[in-house]
Amino acid sequence: MNSRPAEKIDNNDGQTETPRSKTVSTINSTDALAMVEHSSELTLSITTPVGTKFVCRTPFIGTHTDKFLLVEMPKISADDLQYFFQEGFWMNIRAISPRGEGALIHFRSQLMHILQEPVPMAFLSIPNTMQVSQLRKEPRFELNLAGKVLFDEHRGDCELRDLSRSGCRFITPPLGKTYQVGDLVALEIFSDLRGTKTFPPLTGKICNLQRSLHHARYGLEFNEEGRNNAKNLLAQLKFNGTKLTLNAEKKA
């Protein structure tokens, strides 16, 4: 596995940021793709032979015989689809893996085939290697805790999916309010199974987002208050063999 100093890279919303890890590693594509969750969003950056650039997002389906990467056809206009999605065109692809320490996976791929029936999908080439940038200094612990997300005067449902001392990942219902990168939010996580009490809020700013059919998924980077409250929350959770849970769940 090769490593080199990290470069500035685009985050999931097209803004430039530097990964917190100091290296970008080159690993084989089989191991890299195993880090990408099915149905997660891929960002495709296409450059036509005449130099016109186009960026869109589309869900990742999976792989076929280790030769092709299968993706849904993006929801863009028919004109853009016809002009930018032509067999033989090259594109840069970016995926975010939320597992463990988190990673940004990026590689170059060629559009090989387009299938229209029975469902539209694109077949993309799989390179031998891919670049992986670690996003976090520390691992995040998987959990599944309900709560509320607060933004300005809005208060909506959320679910905390993983947590570390410096950040977390949470999801919201697909029809709920959409938050943008840079928004300052607070998560009030329920401290009892009935949802009548909450832990001190996890506060910080949205640093990335992904959307799917079932929910919107956000990465949150804590501020100082959020880091202190996250440390307190982690101290009150217990590991049940697969994920962190409330102490109350152990007794229920």
From Swiss-Prot:
Q: Which residues form the signal peptide?
A: none
Q: Domain PilZ: where?
A: 134-233
Recorded GO MF terms: cyclic-di-GMP binding
Pfam families tied to this protein: PilZ, PilZNR
Q: Which UniProt keywords apply?
A: Bacterial flagellum, c-di-GMP, Nucleotide-binding
Comp. bias (Basic and acidic residues): 1-11
**UniProt-annotated location(s):** Bacterial flagellum basal body
Record has Nucleotide-binding as a keyword: yes
What is any one of the record's Gene Ontology cellular component terms?
bacterial-type flagellum basal body
Q: Where is this region: Disordered?
A: 1-24
* Primary residence: other
Write down the InterPro entries for this protein, in alphabetical order: PilZ_domain, Split_barrel_FMN-bd, T3SS_YcgR_PilZN
Composition bias (Polar residues) maps to 12-24
Q: Which family does it belong to?
A: Belongs to the YcgR family.
Quaternary structure per UniProt? Dimer.
Q: What does this protein do?
A: May act as a flagellar brake, regulating swimming and swarming in a bis-(3'-5') cyclic diguanylic acid (c-di-GMP)-dependent manner. Increasing levels of c-di-GMP lead to decreased motility (Potential). Binds bis-(3'-5') cyclic diguanylic acid (c-di-GMP) with a dissociation constant of 170 nM in the presence of 10 mM KCl and with 100 nM in its absence. Binds 1 to 2 c-di-GMP per subunit. Only 1 c-di-GMP is seen in the wild-type crystal, while 2 are seen in the mutant. Depending on the concentration of K(+) stoichiometries of 1:1, 1.43:1 and 2:1 are determined by isothermal titration calorimetry.
Question: What is the recorded name of this protein?
Answer: Cyclic di-GMP binding protein VCA0042
Q: Which organism is it from?
A: Vibrio cholerae serotype O1 (strain ATCC 39315 / El Tor Inaba N16961)
